[in-house]
């Protein structure tokens, strides 16, 4: 993921620096180069959009590349298709799905590998101290399975847009809920599903 995105910077890069882990950065997405880097550097975790992992799987070198070092692929930006989860699963690789924005620093929800197939298409549950709700056009909370705007509240929410008080006021309501503009729903267990971004 690009370093100018919250996922590329906070999810992997800063975390790796904090833990003293090696980090492999490539200038752009070239499926062959990514596969070669995974094999050469024994990559254990990788963050990307489903399309990135799809492009890698479609490359002729995919079937012959040693991916045995990879434990987890962290996916964001869109739901990950079951066929892609199954394809990588055949190689012993699990997926985690997340949802967030720069304004949510970085996660609003996260789905670990143990629930990846059971909650297919879900972006998971909010992290500790973070709440997610779905509202209608009148800012009224909706029930399970009802689609509406995804709103997030917690200490991870930005304080505001730099020198843009009007934009801040339209994004964060008087109760502190950040209005993402994204459409989704919660299931009966509180798992978030993204419908439109």
Q: Which positions does each model-derived feature cover?
A:
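Alpha-helix capping/helix-boundary segments
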Residues: 30, 51-53, 80, 157
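Conserved AMP-binding/adenylation subdomain of ANL enzymes
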Residues: 4-44, 59
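Conserved ATP-binding/catalytic segment of the ANL
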Residues: 125, 141-145, 149-197
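Conserved helix-loop-beta element of the AMP-binding
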Residues: 24, 44-48, 61-83, 89-90
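Short gly/Ser/Thr-rich phosphate-binding loop of adenylate-forming enzymes
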Residues: 35, 72-94, 101, 111, ...
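Residue-level signal for inorganic ion chemistry
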Residues: 20, 38, 46-49, 139, ...
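Active-site loops of AMP-binding adenylate-forming
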Residues: 60-61, 89, 93, 101-120, ...
